[in-house]
């Protein structure tokens, strides 16, 4: 097994190598690379498959009790500063490696069919491999500096993939929005890392944690420095958390994620399941021993997660775009994870990260299958082929997609025995013990989750067939939706099986996941049937209420949705307009910045440019005047000399 650990650096290098080979081919041998397109895709899938085998081997080794492994080399060494790079493997790393590689390889297989007719097919696989390599590098990083490097690479890849169809104005705007929004969080993360280094003199997680503990006890001060106020330490930790707030789309930096749906559907699955948004939760998990020393920081994290969860769930209720509805669902579930971390439920938050990743990957790939099936009917217009109001009874045309999508929906809603039931139930239980007010928010969010997810399912696969108008399913034109091919369905079936089974590793009866991942042993407590039945009963009960309401409104049509919207007009408008957060940013930041930029332009043109232009004009005119002094006549020169001398003498006498 030592061989696997010594060569674990190959896990991110292999997909990175595949990306570089495609990139060089597109630059130097573009026509040949485009001709060999599926071969390059297969090559990338094989490389990622090897990385998956390595990852599974490491996970098995960690399960068998292999101690954490760290390989470091000194990169920069001076008298006062040293920086090491390398990789670190522990139970958390091993789980994340398998998660990222398994979801990524299924997305690649799916993309081979989904993107087959796209002109950027080869470029897409290059971006996809680079994206996966960046996340794998982040997971293996042993310190904050290395994490920050791969953190930025993940952000760059998301920019490229969200704007993959860059000729579309909406996609171009979306990738810029994602990039700028994440700059806010990344800048905070950068300042926080520098602040923690200033206090502790280290970028290593364990060293920072230990030294901060000593700083709080007054037993540690860096040579040449003074004792640090606790408030400053809190500020540094909050700045670090600003990075995960943006990357994991937490309120109020969540606005980029719904617009990220402008990218191809396979990358939406990867962003929302195993890579970009998971990076934020992963960093919070890595920083957990540090954050946990500051109750104010933990409380802030918990409340940010809870607010994000409830706001995103309310917004998701009124979304008609299939992918954007799932995007707000992702934001809400990420809020669950962050809230769990904030209340100290480390293992529950990580377990929900795993179960949600597979469930959400299944739902996004299922939505892509539906969109693919709708394209022959309504064309390639996203406003139609993603609009749930144009769908209905798709189950008759796409039975496999419908079944797998239903399994993903059941899981996300927390219906037993699906995966997310076990993780969500554990989060609710831990939250109830820590802060009952947050439990109420999380419990209501669970009901809303069930309602909007089954609303999606019923609008797409059940309900009325001709909801969008009789022209949608034109039998005479033979333009009915049809089931996707095997390359799309096989990943869906595999993810459906994983979604059904993966939750059993974290059941409260024998929580193998907690025993494996929880190195700090912070949450060990005996299992109690009464507690389990009360917590699970309340969460399943609210989920069933949401399911029933969605069925009555969108499947059986016994309740008029428009009447409810008219009755709850203020709340409906608030939800439909996304709590006006985008409007606030548009007015408060974009318009103000543009106005300031316009004023700066006017100042530059009229004042600064005016002064410079006047200086040039004055110089030219002075030269034009003075050139007549040089007339070649000696008499004129003598006159000037005498006149200047006379002026000088008179001036001297006067003074």
Curated annotation (Swiss-Prot):
Top enzyme class: translocase
Compartments, as annotated in UniProt: Plastid, Chloroplast thylakoid membrane
Main location: plastid
This enzyme's EC code(s): 7.1.1.-
Catalytic activity: a plastoquinone + NADH + (n+1) H(+)(in) = a plastoquinol + NAD(+) + n H(+)(out); a plastoquinone + NADPH + (n+1) H(+)(in) = a plastoquinol + NADP(+) + n H(+)(out)
Gene3D superfamilies hit by this protein: 1.20.5.2700
GO MF terms, alphabetically ordered: NADH dehydrogenase (ubiquinone) activity; quinone binding
Alphabetical keyword list: Chloroplast, Membrane, NAD, NADP, Plastid, Plastoquinone, Quinone, Thylakoid, Translocase, Transmembrane, Transmembrane helix, Transport
GO cellular component: chloroplast thylakoid membrane
Membrane-spanning residues: 7-27, 40-60, 89-109, 124-144, 147-167, 185-205, 226-246, 265-285, 296-316, 334-354, 361-381, 402-422, 434-454, 488-508, 533-553, 635-655
Membrane-topology descriptor: Multi-pass membrane protein
Gene Ontology terms describing biological process: ATP synthesis coupled electron transport; electron transport coupled proton transport
Family under the similarity heading: Belongs to the complex I subunit 5 family.
Subunit (UniProt): NDH is composed of at least 16 different subunits, 5 of which are encoded in the nucleus.
Function: NDH shuttles electrons from NAD(P)H:plastoquinone, via FMN and iron-sulfur (Fe-S) centers, to quinones in the photosynthetic chain and possibly in a chloroplast respiratory chain. The immediate electron acceptor for the enzyme in this species is believed to be plastoquinone. Couples the redox reaction to proton translocation, and thus conserves the redox energy in a proton gradient.
Protein name, entry field: NAD(P)H-quinone oxidoreductase subunit 5, chloroplastic
């Amino acid at each position: 097994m030592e061989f696997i650990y010594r060569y674990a650096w190959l896990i991110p290098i292999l997909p990175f190598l595949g990306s570089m080979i495609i990139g060089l081919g597109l630059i130097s041998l573009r026509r040949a690379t485009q001709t060999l397109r599926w071969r390059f895709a297969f090559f990338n899938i094989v490389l990622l498959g090897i990385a998956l085998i390595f990852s599974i081997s490491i996970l098995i080794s960690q399960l068998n009790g292999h101690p954490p492994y760290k390989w470091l080399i000194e990169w920069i060494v001076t008298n006062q500063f040293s920086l090491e790079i390398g990789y670190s493997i522990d139970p958390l790393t091993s789980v994340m490696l398998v998660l990222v590689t398994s979801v990524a390889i299924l997305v690649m297989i799916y993309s081979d069919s989904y993107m087959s007719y796209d002109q950027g097919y080869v470029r897409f696989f290059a971006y996809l491999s680079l994206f996966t390599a960046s996340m794998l590098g982040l997971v293996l990083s042993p310190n904050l500096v290395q994490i920050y490097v791969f953190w930025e690479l993940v952000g760059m890849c998301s920019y490229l993939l969200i704007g993959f169809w860059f000729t579309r104005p909406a996609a171009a705007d979306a990738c810029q929005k994602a990039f700028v929004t994440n700059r806010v969080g990344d800048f905070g993360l950068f300042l926080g890392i520098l602040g923690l280094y200033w206090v502790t003199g280290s970028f290593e997680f364990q060293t920072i944690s230990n030294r901060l503990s000593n700083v709080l006890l007054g037993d540690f001060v860096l040579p040449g420095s003074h004792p640090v106020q606790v408030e400053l330490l809190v500020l540094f930790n909050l700045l670090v958390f600003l990075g995960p707030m943006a990357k994991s789309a937490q309120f109020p930096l969540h606005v980029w994620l719904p617009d990220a749906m402008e990218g191809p559907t396979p990358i939406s699955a990867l962003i929302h399941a195993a890579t970009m948004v998971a990076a934020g939760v992963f960093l919070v998990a890595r920083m957990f021993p540090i954050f946990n020393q500051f109750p104010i920081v933990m409380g802030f994290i918990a409340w940010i997660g809870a607010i994000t969860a409830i706001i995103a769930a309310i917004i998701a209720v009124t979304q008609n775009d299939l992918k954007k509805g799932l995007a707000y669902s992702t934001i809400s579930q990420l809020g669950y994870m962050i809230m769990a971390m904030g209340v100290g439920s480390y293992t529950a938050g990580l377990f929900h990260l795993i179960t949600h990743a597979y469930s959400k990957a299944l739902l996004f790939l299922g939505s892509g299958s539906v969109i693919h099936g709708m394209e022959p009917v309504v064309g390639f217009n996203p406003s139609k082929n993603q609009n749930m109001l144009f769908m209905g009874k798709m189950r008759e045309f796409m039975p496999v997609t419908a079944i797998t999508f239903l399994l993903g929906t059941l899981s996300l809603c927390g219906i037993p025995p699906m995966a997310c039931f076990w993780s969500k139930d554990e989060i609710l239980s831990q939250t109830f013990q820590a802060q009952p007010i947050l439990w109420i928010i999380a419990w209501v969010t669970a009901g809303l989750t069930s309602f909007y997810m089954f609303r999606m399912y019923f609008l797409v696969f059940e309900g009325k067939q001709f909801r969008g108008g009789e022209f949608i399913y034109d039998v005479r034109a033979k333009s009915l939706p049809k089931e996707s091919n095997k390359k799309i369905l096989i990943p869906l079936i595999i993810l459906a099986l994983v979604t059904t089974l993966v939750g059993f590793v974290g059941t409260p009866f024998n929580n193998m996941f907690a025993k494996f991942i929880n190195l700090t042993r912070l949450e060990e407590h005996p299992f109690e049937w009464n507690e389990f039945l009360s917590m699970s009963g309340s969460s399943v009960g609210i989920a069933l209420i949401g399911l029933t309401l969605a069925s009555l409104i969108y499947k059986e049509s016994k309740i008029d949705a428009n009447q409810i919207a008219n009755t709850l007009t203020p709340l409906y408008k608030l939800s439909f307009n996304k709590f006006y957060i985008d409007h606030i940013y548009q007015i408060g930041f974009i318009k103000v910045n543009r106005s300031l930029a316009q004023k700066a332009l006017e100042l530059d043109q009229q004042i600064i440019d005016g002064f410079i232009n006047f200086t040039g004009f004055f110089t030219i005119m002075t030269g034009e005047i003075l050139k007549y002094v040089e007339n070649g006549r000696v008499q004129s020169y003598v006159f000037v000399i005498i006149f200047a001398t006379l002026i000088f003498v008179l001036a001297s006498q006067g003074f």
